[in-house]
Amino acid sequence: MSNGIVIIGSGFAARQLVKNIRKQDASIPLTLIAADSMDEYNKPDLSHVISQGQRADDLTRQTAGEFAGQFNLHLFPHTWVTDIDAEAHVVKSQNNQWQYDKLVLATGASAFVPPVPGRELMLTLNSQQEYRACETQLRDARRVLIVGGGLIGSELAMDFCRAGKAVTLIDNAASILASLMPPEVSSRLQHRLTEMGVHLLLKSQLQGLEKTDSGILATLDHQRSIEVDAVIAATGLRPETALARRAGLTINRGVCVDSYLQTSNDDIYALGDCAEINGQVLPFLQPIQLSAMVLAKNLLGNNTPLKLPAMLVKIKTPELPLHLAGETQRQDLRWQINTERQGMVARGVDDADQLRAFVVSEDRMKEAFGLLKTLPM
């Protein structure tokens, strides 16, 4: 009798995989094991919950029971997997174990919290569960410090500002979105955040946090300090690799997989935020969707390589939204920036005048799909 496929995780990657498997095979045994409730929610919504007045439970789209019934699944929520015996094809928790034919790691990534004194006072918003734990504090907070000016930090800064809170955003870099694009491109959004009232502390460093009678005292470099009611870490994600490491799989930044999503063990695969595909960690929805389609085929006996096209990344800052694609972080590109009242188109070209990247904003985002077609594969 077939032991079927065991998936560790229940987030977007795991669910996309389940849907793609069931399109092709209605009966192969599918078992999902995860530490959370396994209820479905849309993770990008976490960047907008405060301005929209949503509670954690409002985010639930489908309960675990409904999910299991719809797709004929064996679910084990609130279950921590402790070990994988790759040789015996067994997954273990404290009180249970599961035999598998094929195993998929979809363990996601955890929010990185800067290792400063008082780091335990920092909140993270990387899951519905994390939001549920801190939603009262965030709703009641009047003064909010966001640590990190990347994609999530910028989205959160705008959202909290739209909710009427006093927002300070701190980052080591000289501009927001510094790992994604040069300052001359991000300056439009940076200016908009400042106009809205976000206090930007760039080229600045958080040195420690301390609880006070009236809030949290954040100590910064250059003998500065600020008192706030809540501090949110938005300093990036770290792929969850501990389980894979204990199983003896090859690890770099994430769980290393090839173009077939296969790890260094023939019967173990990785998908989503935890996976490093041919040296790249791609924690965005579109590559995860495409990876899930390919992996479903391969788990069912095909041999299909993943081929990723040029893809859009969306920065969901409603007052000034951005779409970007290509190698926007490349240092050697020349940027041709066309700015109008209704939006911006920034083109990054190489020495041969070949388009390598672009960023578009506001009403000019409709030009993204035409530009996308001209990017090299």
Swiss-Prot record:
InterPro entries (UniProt xref): FAD-bd_OxRdtase, FAD/NAD-bd_sf, FAD/NAD-binding_dom, NO_rdtase_NorW, Rbx-bd
GO molecular function: oxidoreductase activity, acting on iron-sulfur proteins as donors, NAD or NADP as acceptor
Reaction(s) this enzyme catalyzes, per UniProt: 2 reduced [nitric oxide reductase rubredoxin domain] + NAD(+) + H(+) = 2 oxidized [nitric oxide reductase rubredoxin domain] + NADH
Swiss-Prot/TrEMBL cofactor(s): FAD
Subcellular localization, as worded in the UniProt entry: Cytoplasm
Assigned keywords, A-Z: Cytoplasm, FAD, Flavoprotein, NAD, Oxidoreductase
EC number assigned by the record: 1.18.1.-
GO cellular component: cytoplasm
Pfam families, alphabetized: Pyr_redox_2 (PF07992), Rbx_binding (PF18113)
Pathways per UniProt: Nitrogen metabolism; nitric oxide reduction
Protein family (similarity comment): Belongs to the FAD-dependent oxidoreductase family.
Protein role: One of at least two accessory proteins for anaerobic nitric oxide (NO) reductase. Reduces the rubredoxin moiety of NO reductase.
Protein known as: Nitric oxide reductase FlRd-NAD(+) reductase
Organism: Shigella sonnei (strain Ss046)
Name of the gene this protein is made from: norW
